[in-house]
Amino acid sequence: ISAPQREFLTSDAKYIYCQGGYGSGKTIIACVKAILLTVAIPGNRGVVIRESYPKLHDSTQRTFMECLDRAHIRYKGRENRDGWYHRLIIPVKGGSSEVFFRETKNLGRFLGSEFGWWLVDEALEVDKDVFKKLQGRLRLPAARGHYAGMLVSNPPHLNHWLHEVFGEEPRSFSVEVAIQGEIELSTFRYMQVSTRQNPHNPPGYLADLLTGLTQAEIDRLVEGQYGYIPDGPPVYPMFEHHRHVGLPTLP
């Protein structure tokens, strides 16, 4: 695995957000970590979240199921809709664990009361309210001491709630909360990953991705940095410093 993937996998932060460019390997390592938490803790319960079921089925859940198959992990499927299981029961040593797959629509209605981990893929597509609801359900007794709230996403715009919660620069930090005279800590980790850091992309992938992109688009879609996301066709071409700024022509 790549160095950023190893960092994500070994982080003990309660809430970890990985923001990365296309093909940076963020979704697959989040699925691997979710599976490890599922099989290592008997009775654990987790949920994989995406903005809609079509996106969940076509991308995130497909990756999750491929990881299970590669690891030769057996499971029993439940809640079959549209050819996809939305609940898995995974036999583990000492019992079994569960994994749910949900879209954000009517999330409160379909979420269980308690989870040991959750994973939100493409978090830029969901509202902050989803994050708050999931925070309130990260309390499964079986997973005490090993809770994990995971978010992965392509870079959102600068005024997105992810920027508000996790900050502008990659960092680890904690938030202190006073409860009945005692201080409790919530730990956070924000990672930023570039497409260039994934050695497993096919030959030519990065070159194809870079073709035709402006520097601002490269910063966001390749380097994984926050940036402006245009909506609709531009009235004027996007500003590029190297193209539109220069020395004046002297007479």
Protein language model features and the residues they cover:
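ATPase catalytic-site recognition across NTP-hydrolyzing enzymes
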Residues: 198-251
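Walker B catalytic acidic pair
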Residues: 121-122
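ASCE P-loop NTPase helicase motor core
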Residues: 125-204, 208
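Pre-Walker A adenine-sensing motif
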Residues: 1-13
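Short hydrophobic/aromatic beta-strand immediately N-terminal to the Walker A/P-loop
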Residues: 16-19, 47
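Inter-Walker segment of RecA-like/P-loop motor cores
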Residues: 54-116, 226
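Walker A/P-loop NTP-binding motif
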Residues: 27-42
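Conserved RecA-like ASCE P-loop NTPase motor core of nucleic-acid helicases/translocases
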Residues: 44-56
